[in-house]
């Protein structure tokens, strides 16, 4: 099991990116959350099996879908905390 925090920049707010991330996470059985940040980036906190989480990171990093254009993803490993679902946070 592994947990990462990701800061995603590019055209990622106002284009359905958080919902896209949630769909991918749920399909891959990844838990955690996603939220918009005031500076126009999106933060993702994700937890899952190491190999699945690596695939998730690659998928997010390579997203070019419709108006969504990911330009950069900063990933930092964190201590596993045991999320049970994946949610969109609005804080």
Curated annotation (Swiss-Prot):
GO terms for molecular function: acylphosphatase activity. The keyword DNA repair does not apply. The active site is at residues 18, 36. It comes from the Archaea. Its EC number is 3.6.1.7. The keyword Transport does not apply. Keywords: Hydrolase. It is an enzyme of class 3 (hydrolase). It catalyses: an acyl phosphate + H2O = a carboxylate + phosphate + H(+). Residues 3-90 form the Acylphosphatase-like domain. Belongs to the acylphosphatase family. This is Acylphosphatase. It comes from Methanospirillum hungatei JF-1 (strain ATCC 27890 / DSM 864 / NBRC 100397 / JF-1). The gene is acyP.
